[in-house]
Swiss-Prot record:
PANTHER family hit by this protein: DENN DOMAIN-CONTAINING, DENN DOMAIN-CONTAINING PROTEIN 1A
Domain dDENN: 298-375
Pfam name, any one: dDENN
Protein name (Swiss-Prot/TrEMBL): DENN domain-containing protein 1A
Lineage start: Eukaryota, Metazoa, Chordata, Craniata, Vertebrata
Membrane topology of the entry: Peripheral membrane protein
Motif FXDXF motif, chain ranges: 378-382
Amino acid sequence: MGSRLKQNPDTTFEVYIEVNRPGSTDEDPELQRIFPEDFSDQEVLQTVTKFCFPFSLDSLTSSHVGQNFTFVLTDIDSKQRFGFCRLSSGAKSCFCILSYLPWFEAFYKLLNILAEYSSKNQDSQRNELLKTLHGHPIPEPGTPMHLSVHSHFTVPDSQELPSIPENRNLTEYFVAVDVNNMLHLYASMLYERRILICCSKLSTLTACIHGSSAMLFPMYWQHVYIPVLPPHLLDYCCAPMPYLIGIHSSLMEKVKGMSLDDVVFLNVDTNTLETPFDDLQNLPNEVVSALKNRIRKMSTTTGDGVARAFLKAQASLFGSYRNALKIEPEEPITFCEETFVSHRSSGLRPFLQNAIQLQLFKQFIDGRLDLLNSGNGFSDVFEEEINMGEYAGSDKLYHQWLSTVKKGSGAFINTMKTRANPAMKTVYKFAKDHAKMGIKEVKNRLKQKDMAENGFSTATEEPLPQISPSSIEKKRGEERRPITVHFGQVRPPRPHVPRRPKSNAVVESRTTAGSSPDQPQQYRTLKESDADGDEAISPEKDSSEATVKEPQSTEVKHVSLLEDIFSNLQTEPPLLSQAKSLEDLRTPKEDHENQFTFDYQRMDLTAQERTRTIPAMKHGHPYNKLWSMGHDDMAIPNKYLQISPERHLTLPSNSTVTPHKDSALTNIEKEVTIASSQGNITIPRPHGRKTPELGIVPPPPAPRGIKLQTAMTDANKQQTGDSSNYHGQITEGSLRELSADNGEKETAGSSTSEILKPVKVSTEVGMNDDDLLSLLDPLKAGRYQTASQPPMGTLPHSFETPCCSSTPLLTSLQSDFVSPAFSHQLGFAPQPAFLHSPLNPFAQALAAEKTASVMGPPMGVFKAPVATALGSHSFLPTPGIYHSPRPLTSALQGSNLFGQISSGTPLNPVIRQSHSLSETQSNMPLMTSIPAGHRTLPMVQSRSKHQDGKPREYPPIPPRPAKLLEPALLPTKSDQPIDPFEDLLNKTKQTVTPASGKVEHLRKQWETFE
């Protein structure tokens, strides 16, 4: 294989000698001792003695040349013999062992022991050790060898890669020379240049020579190889052939005087390299860069990493030699140089074209061919690296030989036919294994990529497609996208906090009928729901195809809660910033295995409302506000709110329709419904009852602006003229003015700095009689609106008032006591019943029969109840305010509460509505109609003059004792409306001038109320 090591030497060493340093350069070294004593090769003895002192004896630094070094002698067969030397202190003498075995560490250790014996004149121990070593059979590589108590070592293996720090030569070479110089030296050796290395220490010098040449494995330097050059052989530096020579720095002055042309010179002491060639640049760039990176990574680690980095470079350059092997029947295996060069890439061909002319490569190929043709075969780390790397290519012929060829007496035993089948099997298995590993790696990478992007594996669950509506679908005005529920994984129950109401779509599914926040039901994925083979209908598909695949049902139709409301409807999915969950971003599919029943309510507005644009409107429609608010739980059906009682939704429609009893029951039993109309309220039925109760709907409050009243009065007159068509309609003027009015309230109430401002107290004499009373009356709560609510036109929730103020003058006084911003900051936690202090100066202090416990967010708005006897649950229209259930009081069994008409007396709902409207149209805007089946609380016109001023927010009023409401709970006459506050107003008819101290005292009580 081109190795210059002698195989199977006769003894472990040839000769051991001790040499004394000569007194001058003209004298020869004096031989002191020799073992074995019968060694007769005088020529070798003369040469060895001259190599024992390879430096200038006249140099002042000759005593500091180091201790251990190795020289090499070449025999007649071009085999190397290593001379392991150890210089004594001051370099006065040298101990040398000449051997064919490259056991550097073992012989250095033995030399130290022998030097100690000589210094102590222990000749018997020295001779015994040398005799044992010389007569010991050569052990196998890797086996321990015991010579004496103090001399034992492990036999090194020349076929293994050298490691750091076990290999002394590689360790010193790697420490002394930097990476770039190592690469340049490696490239120069591949191009077989004339290389000179100099150093002031003999140990480092010879280590660099041996270490650099070892990096050529599995190739060997085939030219002049002199690790350390003695003074009498300096003329070798002018040799025309390639060489690798080490010279002590004391001899460099003589070498520089010679004509050295095309010599690569490396000075280890200064770590500088001089070369007239571009050998490193001529190597393939990918090989050099990979080698450099590997060496730098291994610079701080131990082991064979550095040697393996060079081995990989050798494999990448020469590993494809297998493809150039030619196997002919009954002929020796040969190597085709043209095939070796032509099958590689164009960037590598120039180097390979030069490599086939190199002596080291030719010796390498000849050694491989000798082993192949002899039938012995081979297996070393280089071949293993080729098999592991990507350098082998299609080495079919080589595998064919490895599996089948056997040669004896110079002839093949088997024919090529018998060798072909097992060879092909080997190649097939090799390729199959590599293919499987490659496919598995690709799958794993794709799986990891999908899991990193989507959060789940595609092998177990298919991701829900996100389909954006196309332009074709937007043009289909009659097609309706089906309302589907969110299918996905079960989410943990959320904390019981106040939430906004659900949308107005009541969706019921058999698969999710029992879901609740505390016990969520596992939603089936679309992949499971489509197990029957039905594919989900994409919104992009044709409507005819969608109709065929849709389950036939008379109750289920394509329902759209968002279309057919306004012309400026936004049907695009909510923005990413509005989504609180990944489920909001998915486009749900239809489940064809289960049929869903959709029950919906919608607002049918007039044609004017369809075409107009509501001011200060963020969303195109109130429903869009609901669908994009962010709580993804609202999209899950049958998920009950913890803060909202069960109530039936009653919305006005264009035609006067009597509520159907069955449909009302169905809606109540199936799902929670939230009121979305403006101006009506429905009393929830008590648990266990099957018929919904009729509610009492007080009219909305009146604005207090003169300019606003003019437009509102005109609008109301227009509606009064046609009371039959009024049901379910909202006048454009009132809606615009109300939205503007509410916009002003939002602006006024949004500033939090007003909380710290001093409260304005009016102390004018001649104040209206009803001012202070309206402040203290819990029924004068006025309109409720938080800073977070949208304008009137875009309210997604019901906007109702339990009662309304009779005059705008009362409102102006009420807002003087408490600032608008301060009213938003009051939130009342549930508290037990307590006695109220008499806030009304004209009424006696009464014990509170039942105080309404208010629950809401800290920034919520307090709302007073209409009455304590309206039902088993008292609730308020704004979400987040919940009144605890209270038993029916005796007032229900009294005198026809709120003028309730007996069941036996029929009453035309249209007449009743028009009657109520005629009485109250002059001082209040009617936002929505009062549907049939509900009773209205009529209001008397104010006898006071209207006061100019901006509408203000009402101060929060705590629950009042129920007895204060009794004057209003009087029977009403069918022909004339009765003011429920008439008695109380008559009682307080006298003019009251509040004192400044009294008002200040009341204001402090309101501010400190908990």
